């Protein structure tokens, strides 16, 4: 597996410009499109590269996937059990309380308030993640990545609840 940052000719940093990422992705897709190949071997190689470009783009454009990938590049693999062990009992309790709050909320306006709350939590966490990666503090980056994963779980559960209320 080639380094996704290198593949897209981007600096290996968490705080990437998503517009530049998209521009690089499309430029590389044009360059390595299988239909532009002159030989069958070249076409096969371009198909492999094109597939890798798709994976790289989908990973790097998402804040959580990008954080997990950057940690993986440092040989830190966040599986579910490890994520649970990174958060304090208080943080886990807060998470479960929020899950319960979503479950028990019935008014659409209250669900919208929760949505705004979780978006703010996500943005604050991403800002902390950016700082942790700038400082190369992998311990903090790991913790903030696990928190972001929990926030995403809350957002997903909330989206399901909002859909069921419509």
Curated annotation (Swiss-Prot):
Record's keyword annotation contains Repeat: no
Assembly with partners or alone: Interacts with HscA and stimulates its ATPase activity.
UniProt keyword Membrane present: no
A Pfam family annotated for this UniProt entry: DnaJ
Protein keywords: Chaperone
Domain J: residue ranges: 3-73
Name of the coding gene: hscB
Family: Belongs to the HscB family.
Molecular-function GO terms, alphabetical: ATPase activator activity; protein-folding chaperone binding
Family matches, as SUPFAM superfamilies: Chaperone J-domain, HSC20 (HSCB), C-terminal oligomerisation domain
Recorded superkingdom: Bacteria
GO biological process: [2Fe-2S] cluster assembly; protein complex oligomerization; protein folding
Functional description taken from the UniProt entry: Co-chaperone involved in the maturation of iron-sulfur cluster-containing proteins. Seems to help targeting proteins to be folded toward HscA.
Signal peptide: none
InterPro entries recorded: DnaJ_domain, HscB, HscB_C_sf, HscB_oligo_C, J_dom_sf
Protein name as it appears in the record: Co-chaperone protein HscB homolog
Source organism of this protein record: Rickettsia prowazekii (strain Madrid E)
């Amino acid at each position: 597996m080639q380094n996704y940052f290198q593949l897209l000719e981007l600096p290996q940093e968490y705080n990437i410009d998503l517009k530049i990422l998209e521009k690089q992705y499309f430029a590389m897709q044009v360059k390595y499109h299988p239909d532009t190949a002159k030989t069958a071997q070249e076409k096969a190689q371009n198909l492999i590269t094109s597939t890798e470009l798709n994976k790289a783009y989908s990973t790097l454009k998402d804040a959580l996937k990008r954080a997990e990938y950057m940690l993986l590049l440092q040989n830190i693999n966040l599986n579910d059990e490890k994520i649970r062990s990174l958060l304090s009992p208080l943080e886990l309790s807060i998470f479960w309380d929020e899950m319960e709050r979503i479950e028990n909320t019935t008014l659409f306006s209250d669900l919208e308030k929760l949505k705004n709350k979780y978006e703010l939590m996500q943005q604050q966490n991403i800002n902390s993640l950016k700082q942790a990666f700038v400082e190369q503090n992998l311990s903090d980056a790991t913790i903030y990545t696990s928190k972001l994963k929990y926030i995403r779980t809350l957002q997903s559960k909330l989206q399901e609840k909002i859909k069921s209320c419509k």
